[in-house]
Amino acid sequence: MRIFAPAVNDFFISLLLMGALSGGPTLPLPYWAQTGQYGRMPSTAGSMMWVQARTQFDDARTFQWRWGVGLTSNSVVSRFADECYLSGRWKALTLDAGLKHREMDFLGASPSLGSLSVTGGHLIESGNTRAMPGYRLSLAPVDIPFTHGHLALYGFWGDFKTLDRRWVDEALVHRGEIFLMARIGEHLELHAGLDHYALWGGTAMDANWYNYWRVVTGSRASESGSRSDQINVIGDHGGSECFKLKWTEDEWIATFQHDIPYSDRSGMRFNNFPDGVNTLNFGWTRKDRWISDILYEFHYTRNQSGPLHEAETDADGNVIPWHKGMHIAGGDDYFNNGEYRSGWTYYGRTIGLPLFYPAGTRARTWEPNTLVRGVENNRIRAHHLGLSGQFFRRMPYKLMLTYSQNYGTFGSPYAGESAWGKPWGSVKETPLWQFSAALLGEVPSLFGQNWLHLTYGLYGDYGQVLPSQMGVSLGVRCCWGKW
């Protein structure tokens, strides 16, 4: 038996040249032209080049490895490493080291067109930003002993470093996920688990093993830490609780997924009900249909454990003893933090749910790769529809339609009176509505050449938050090997 072999398996190389136009030279590209693109697209009208090469795991080997490199250049950023990683796999364990994007769920007729979901199936890591350098140790589903294959565990553990300009420079990121999967009969799977992140270190605290242990265990800071970290937990913690049902048949797969965001213990105790992202997806296993995949999502994040959060310390900084009438669970303020003020963003873009617009979006002062103070809009109500298939059973496409009502944050509402500090329901809040649409597609095998493909995109924004405009993108992809 060959334990290790450096043979190349399914080598793939691709070059994409693309141009994009918006409603004006100073306007940002429409929402879906730059959202969910791993930060590759320019923020305004311009051009983009993306070249990549990678290999795949060889399942015939006991120990398998793969590598990948990618370089992106656009009219806003001259060039940057999109991916650069080396991965090894042994049985159920996979170690990825370097710059590597997380793979998305709910893909349609062509993986190259991306996910049909706003979040890519991951509320916390949606594929909206560039990759961070670090490592991720993943565990594929492993059966729990004595359950006769009915129960399995899977997840990952990882640590990364931020490289962008931030309020706390050189902040570190700890990531972790753990899921329990139950197999019921031949067709039904139930999944339940946590997807967690923590920002720590950087110029805000020492990055040592002592603090790392307190971060991963969710402990409070020592006396040398900030007052906030001594009261709550060390660093900025957030994540999502996920519940998923998946029914698989030979010809189709149906999935329902419910993701609940949290940014403190109150969210983990479901005090923020009914906040969450609800996803319903139906897909045929054969993708050469006019419509092969249908996805609907309902987003609601207005509650955030309520608008009341009383002071936890007195004027002298002493902790006030908790009592039953004390409201300290409200104002979760997803993806924002008072100390790590860049929040859950990277290179100016929201890492998680991209309907949480980064600060400066509505005022049109936002620019990628600049210092951003978190998100300005994390209280939303939204409906999203994604469709995919193949025109004439050979040309993959993806249709995205998103309507949202946006309330800003509790502390800084977009419009009307703020509900912060007032009993729930006593204030009639005023949202700003927004509609964004996109049709993306590919025309494969131009001029009869299997390696040459045309890519296109038509985009539109209309509403009260983003500039009302149309946009278009057109590109040529040259690729060899299996995507």
Regions found by a protein language model. Name each.
Residues 4, 8-13, 54-67, 89-92, ...:
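Short loop/turn motifs that connect adjacent beta-strands in outer-membrane beta-barrel proteins
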Residues 15, 19-27, 65-73, 88, ...:
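Transmembrane beta-barrel strands of outer-membrane/channel proteins
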